[in-house]
């Protein structure tokens, strides 16, 4: 079991009940990856199926969304293969805003 904090910033909170910070307990047996977390987010936290495409494209985080693992770009940490540790902070920030 892993407890993580997930942040939805840059307007992404709009598809997550207007709540920017969520504490998530992943009950899956170790190891739990960021990919597992993303699957959990999509299957349990996005209420409107039409909103999935705002967050996911081609089975990954949509381009234009910066993903950080403990303030480090997820590309440097192995992206979806990163193994979550208790207390990790995962941030998703949309860079695509209305003007």
Curated annotation (Swiss-Prot):
InterPro entries: Beta-grasp_dom_sf (IPR012675), Mopterin_synth/thiamin_S_b (IPR016155), Urm1 (IPR015221). The modification 1-thioglycine is found at residue 99. Pathway: tRNA modification; 5-methoxycarbonylmethyl-2-thiouridine-tRNA biosynthesis. It is found in: Cytoplasm; Nucleus. One of its GO terms (biological process) is protein urmylation. Keywords: Cytoplasm, Isopeptide bond, Nucleus, tRNA processing, Ubl conjugation pathway. One of its GO terms (cellular component) is nucleus. C-terminal thiocarboxylation occurs in 2 steps, it is first acyl-adenylated (-COAMP) via the hesA/moeB/thiF part of UBA4, then thiocarboxylated (-COSH) via the rhodanese domain of UBA4. Its main location: cytoplasm. One of its GO terms (molecular function) is protein tag activity. There is a cross-link at residue 99 (Glycyl lysine isopeptide (Gly-Lys) (interchain with K-? in acceptor proteins)). Acts as a sulfur carrier required for 2-thiolation of mcm(5)S(2)U at tRNA wobble positions of cytosolic tRNA(Lys), tRNA(Glu) and tRNA(Gln). Serves as sulfur donor in tRNA 2-thiolation reaction by being thiocarboxylated (-COSH) at its C-terminus by the MOCS3 homolog UBA4. The sulfur is then transferred to tRNA to form 2-thiolation of mcm(5)S(2)U. Prior mcm(5) tRNA modification by the elongator complex is required for 2-thiolation. Also acts as a ubiquitin-like protein (UBL) that is covalently conjugated via an isopeptide bond to lysine residues of target proteins such as AHP1. Belongs to the URM1 family. Homodimer; homodimerization may provide an autoprotection to the highly active C-terminal residue before attacking its substrates. Interacts with NCS2 and NCS6. Forms a conjugate with the target protein AHP1. Present with 1240 molecules/cell in log phase SD medium. This is Ubiquitin-related modifier 1.
């Amino acid at each position: 079991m892993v407890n993580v904090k997930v942040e939805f910033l840059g307007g992404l909170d709009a598809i997550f009940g207007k709540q920017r910070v969520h504490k998530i307990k992943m009950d899956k047996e170790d190891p739990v990856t960021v990919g597992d977390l993303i699957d959990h987010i999509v299957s349990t936290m996005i209420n409107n199926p039409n909103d999935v495409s705002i967050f996911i494209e081609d089975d990954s985080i949509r381009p234009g969304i910066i993903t950080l693992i403990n303030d480090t770009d997820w590309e440097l940490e192995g992206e979806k293969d990163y193994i979550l540790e208790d207390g990790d902070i995962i941030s998703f920030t949309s860079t695509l805003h209305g003007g």
